[in-house]
Amino acid sequence: MILGLGHVDLVCGDLERSLAFYAAVFGPLGLQDPALFEGERGEQIHYLRFPAPGSGSLGLRQALERQEFELYAPGFHHLALTVDRRDDVDVAHVAAVAAGAEVLHPPRAWPEYHPQYYATFFLDPDGFRIEVSAARDARLV
């Protein structure tokens, strides 16, 4: 039986910039300091831990070379994080703007997803699409 998603790793164009961005945006919501591991290339992988028990972690590691992210190329599309309350979505949005993120959609209700769905969408420093949502009892997919 699958219990959940343990972790997701993002390969970053500038690891230090990405670490600073994720700490600034999600630190106020409880994202914990990274646990460090060595990757298969000998690089450091920084696993940012989510505060809820069993909620997994987000790994950040340095790219071999800088490439532009393409949303609809094979691979990663977006990262969706769930928070407790609408206020937390707003906190993430304000922090993302302060950290220089390009905002795709400011916080609003998305009734086409679920009657209680409330979310914001923005890009991280590498252009990865990040969604932060709050939806009590909403299970999408």
Language-model-detected regions and their locations in the chain:
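N-terminal beta-strand motif that seeds the catalytic metal site of vicinal oxygen chelate
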Residues: 1-19, 79, 136-141
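Core segments of cupin and vicinal oxygen chelate
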Residues: 9-56
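Vicinal oxygen chelate
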Residues: 12-17, 79-125
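Long, continuous compositionally biased terminal/linker segments
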Residues: 43-84, 91
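Short glycine-/small-residue motifs
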Residues: 57, 131-132
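Conserved Rossmann-like nucleotide-cofactor binding loop
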Residues: 128
